[in-house]
Amino acid sequence: MDNNFKIKDLPKNERPQERLIRYGAEVLSNSELLAVILRTGTKNQNIMMLASSLIKETGGLDQLFNQSIEELTKIKGIGVTKAVQILALSELSKRFKTYKSGNEYKISTPLDVSNLVMEDMKYLKQEKLKILILNTKNIVTYIRDVFIGTLNSSIVHPREIFCEAIKKNGASIIICHNHPSGDPTPSKEDINITLRLKKCGKLIGIDLLDHIIIGENKYVSMKEKGTI
């Protein structure tokens, strides 16, 4: 017997699905929208209680959408199925926030770079280095993670960075990495890596346009700071 509380067990005027159909999705709270996705609660919590406590316990939607499947399944009432639903919703949200109609994403300012990578990188618990490869019109043609771990100039080798750009016929590159602390202030190592890659790029004819450091909903551009 299924003892889990379902949306249909709620009074009809309290069911988020009914409210969405009648009034539109925009009137629903975050908890109600999440309840529509998850559908069932537990034997001790109806789905609205579960959705509300889930958002509160993880610290809000941003934090909820950056949990791993292991972290989610440790939360009372969240099994593998619900964790997978949340992860899929999280990924769709990230992709939508960085989506532009058509297949082209042109970089004109550091903010364009931030808008492209922020959702993916701002809450990472480890440092990750991404390379954006651009064509002669500054349109992003390829993005790849090239390193995960603590960045320093002895580990981040220019060969690994520029090899991808050469293979993809890139005209220029932008590198991005995150600071798990949430503070995007460049470290001495960040500056050293930037200068080293800038120098190597000039030698092979693939310019390093910028190095963007991602923090918690903020970023620093090495180009804007005058480092390169």
From Swiss-Prot:
Disulfide bonds: none
Species name: Clostridium botulinum (strain Loch Maree / Type A3)
PROSITE patterns per UniProt: MPN, UPF0758
GO biological process, any: proteolysis
Superkingdom of source: Bacteria
MPN domain location: 106-228
NCBIfam families: PRK00024.1, radc
Record-linked SUPFAM superfamilies: JAB1/MPN domain, RuvA domain 2-like
Residues annotated for Zn(2+) binding in this entry: 177, 179, 190
Signal peptide: none
Keywords: Hydrolase, Metal-binding, Metalloprotease, Protease, Zinc
Sequence motif JAMM motif, residues: 177-190
Full protein name: UPF0758 protein CLK_2387
Keyword Transport: no
Matching InterPro entries: MPN, RadC_JAB, RuvA_2-like, UPF0758, UPF0758_CS, UPF0758_N
